[in-house]
Amino acid sequence: MIDYYQGQPKRIQHFLKVHAYAKLIGEQEGLDKEILDILEVAALTHDIGIKISEEKYNSSAGKYQEVEGPAVAQQMLEDLQYDKAKTDRVCYLIGHHHTYDQIDGIDYQILVEADFLVNLAEEHSSKETIESVKNKIFKTKTGIWLINKIF
């Protein structure tokens, strides 16, 4: 992913921060090795659709990332000979990481929480926005602890 976003420090730093939070939350929540692996790969690749979205739509909006990201990630993960079932789940997570009313697993929940922890800080969100996101989105004990401590 660093090669993929070479020369774009904002993009690289974003996915590395999301990965760090996702790994921390996943470990603290006791995820098993397989789910933690999926979560970590999804965290590193969750915004892989931004590049093609900006080229095709002149936008990095979440809806475009969800449309364009899975195919790019699938090709990358296949090239790396990553497990097929895990690739399918990672691509699902990439294709839904801006959809908050369909969270269907702990990997999805943690990915969303980790992405919000980073986005809320990067966007200098208001206290009201942070509180609203915390109340509507955050479910894990570790994620709630982090959002309370960070903000």
Model-assigned labels for residue ranges:
Residues 76-80, 84, 88-96:
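Mid-chain, well-packed structural core segment of small domains
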